[in-house]
Amino acid sequence: MIGKSMRKIGSLLHRAKPSDILDKMREYINLSESKDIAKSYAAGFILHYALDRSCHPYVYALQNKMVEKYPHLNSHTAHNTIEFSMDTYLLTKRLKAENAYLFDTEGTIIFNEAELDELAKMISYVTSNVTNKQVTPNDVKTAIKDLKYIQKLTIDKSGKKENLVKIIDGIAAPFLNNFKFSALMRPKDLEKAKKYGNIERKTWTSPYDKLKRNDSFEDLFEFANLMQSI
């Protein structure tokens, strides 16, 4: 999108300690005049964190295995391939989506102007304080609107977009350390998507605590849901 890139700041925020982020969210909520909106966003962040904390050991274990087997595979591409494949699998199984690749993710990002204003102020406050990089509310608004636009853009009813993106990948990947944009699109092939979910519950090793486990991705998803309900 037109404007300054927030990618590096986003990476800093992604690597920040969750406790630091939550502390700044608490600070902001105490100052906010729209506490209900701010609390709602904070609750969503906590739910997202619970899901990542539960599922990421498996995702990174498989990502590392894929990169070890295929040294030229970009680690981010491997990560995206796993997560978007699981999107296809869970949307099909849980929401009975007939064509998961057509699921309207843009339609799940809903807000009115008051909510957008509050979210922009909150994310600006948290990000600026956690990363020590200046991020304005307008920067945040642009990022949120860009996210909605990208979600809409990746809906591919005819298959033409995927074909075009793969052509772009072929041209650009050598200059981007083999990063592939096509990995950001949910796969159409459900059987292929399933292969990334450890449905057979084979043993894998967590890269964090080195413990051997045999959970499937769906097992970890269920555990995250259980933690969220406590």
Where are the regions that the model predicts?
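N-terminal leader/auxiliary helical segments
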Residues: 1-44, 49-230
